[in-house]
């Protein structure tokens, strides 16, 4: 039952994010009214005059011109596009915070002369008696970030 609910929610979000309609609160003027002579194929394939889109909210018998000569009218974004932008913003904030936290430790290690290979060996030695067969990905990422920081700060001789 839970799986069915997730399928329905995902189908609803896909349908809402791929809608090709103009927003209801647009300030753009309506170009012309749609009469029964307009074929639905023109609206569905966007072959209509001046790339018009159907205005689905409010008075549904109107067409809004989305591409005007003065500037391009920005269509309301779908749910998936908004979610993607929000996740990218969260990721950027996290990476910025992560660098702020890691850089002081990187500076201390660089002052001690710790190389990239020594750091990797330290992680391997620490994991020997833990029961794991390899180095966890978090340790590998930390070592990779240290190596990238060494290259960025001009200490490439330590990034061996």
Swiss-Prot record:
Kindly give the InterPro entries that the UniProt entry links to this protein: RXLR (IPR031825)
From what superkingdom does this record's organism come?
Eukaryota
Residue span of motif RxLR-dEER: 54-76
Keyword Magnesium listed? The answer is no
Q: Taking the first listed entry, what is the main subcellular location of this protein, grouped into a coarse class?
A: secreted
Q: Which locations, inside or outside the cell, does it occupy?
A: Secreted; Host cell membrane; Host nucleus, Host nucleolus
**Which Pfam families did the record assign?**
RXLR
Induction description: Expression is induced during host plant infection.
Signal sequence annotation: 1-21
Write out the function statement from the record: Effector that is involved in host plant infection. Contributes to virulence during the early infection stage, by inhibiting plant defense responses induced by both PAMP-triggered immunity (PTI) and effector-triggered immunity (ETI).
Entry similarity comment: Belongs to the RxLR effector family.
According to the UniProt entry, the note on domains is: The RxLR-dEER motif acts to carry the protein into the host cell cytoplasm through binding to cell surface phosphatidylinositol-3-phosphate.
What protein name does the entry list? RxLR effector protein PexRD44
What organism is listed for this UniProt entry? Phytophthora infestans (strain T30-4)
